[in-house]
Amino acid sequence: MRHKLILAGGGSGTAEYLLPAAKKALEEVELVIASPRFLELLHARKTMPMGHISELLESLPAMLERESIGIVVSGDPLLYSLCRTLRNRYPELEMQVIPGVGSLQLLGAAFGLTMEQ
């Protein structure tokens, strides 16, 4: 796999929770893969709607031979998300992970609760 992968958390799917670091990194890749709600928030050169994860995992190595890719997932990619799956399946993969604001943080903030409670 010649090119780098950016795995970015998209937060809740609104512009307010898509972090500037994620937007900046995703502008630098050649292809962004995400659900339509995230693709609408980005100004990517080339996009592809997220399909079945199993199909994406199967085709990812060949895709990374051709171009750099950014994948946007809901919430935080480090919490019950795609990061672990990618690391386990492709340990040699060069991947930059950009965290996002997850639903647990949003829920806690809405009720004034800390993550320790």
Language-model-derived ranges and their functions:
Residues 1-107:
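Class I S-adenosyl-L-methionine
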